[in-house]
């Protein structure tokens, strides 16, 4: 039997459709919820991924509910590994949206991310999504550093190659009211509350 679990929120993705005579309110852009599912038996060998310790419990609960055989390892490194960081950009001008896909993480990661974030914001982007691979341990204080740059955890997503990536969002100074989001499943509401708490850490 298929089992579904809310795995990611994608916030402020594109503008609502305009209707004559109808006035919008806060959250003038659409946000999306994504779900993962195990459509068959769960006999595949367990796949392990690295996750920040702070998100291990919520990620484990997502995989457990979806009955997907993934183990979340919360090992952390004292600091970022040597080497240069590579982040690929996929800018969608019509949405004022950008995907920042991390290809490699080196000691200059946060400097590179800060520069790219400032550049896209100055060129009209108002929402940035950061896609981070889970094939290596994260450095201690990873999320705290991302929070300082305005990025906050929004979930996890499967990639085409069968791997998993963490998703972080930066609303680039947009006001956002999580109370306006309406969900009809307990796990989606729980994920929304979790993401809201992460968002609020960027405001401190």
Q: Predicted segment positions?
A:
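Terminal substrate-recognition subdomain of acyl/acetyltransferases
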Residues: 1-110, 114-140, 144-204
